[in-house]
Amino acid sequence: MQANGEPEPMPSPEYVERIQAYMAKALHEAKINTSWIQPNLQWDAAMRDFIAKILDPSSRNKFVPILLPVAQEIARLGAINSLTQTLLKLTSPGVPDIYQGNEVWDYSLVDPDNRRAVDYNRRRDMLQALSTATPRELQTWPDGQIKLFLIQRVLRFRREHADLFRRGEYLPLRASGTFSECCVSFARRLVNKWIVVIAPRFSSRVGFPLVDERWKDTVIELPETLSLAQAHDLFTCRPLPLRDRKVKLADALSILPFAVITSL
């Protein structure tokens, strides 16, 4: 993976070794043709040779050029899932937990691959850069800055309104429209304090990027218990147009593929 988050045009020797180690663990723990206790050395060697050949960086290899576009599409959908999971984790009832290094995209495999050292200097530099970044600039998602931005904004908001997250009730919200099944939404409310969380799911049905008019007529219905005066998005600080206590996803997700609406 390059510094900008884009994949390398060809696999490096280090990457090949990581995939071989991952496959060895998967095969041994499946215990079908080889295992840790009874290793099949020929089978293990054949697996390593197979991985080395399909990831051969030479021009003779026709597999990698076919794999890359598929991997890039999966990565985009995976990024949306990661953002949704992170937002739900930070706003749902309970205490959120973020594994070290996962403040941005983490391309680690299972252990021992996920025990590699975390580049904290890079994350520190990215965090400092957020002070001048605009939401639209974060649409270049491969570098992972959009995830760090989400975490920073929500954790700061949680700290400022701790009671809302500690004691606020959870209210599931209903979506309607063309892509009603492709979003999840809920509110947290404590007396006159509230937030409404909106995040995508099944994003391949909507298309990429998951913003603006792709959502068509999809809306979230807001409960009567929420005072909607001065409602705005936490991430973009934009006021949101509301009609009949409904918010259109084309408005709420016009810049970023997630939203936290609040009047605080």
Where does each model-flagged region fall?
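Carbohydrate-interacting/catalytic domains
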Residues: 1-264
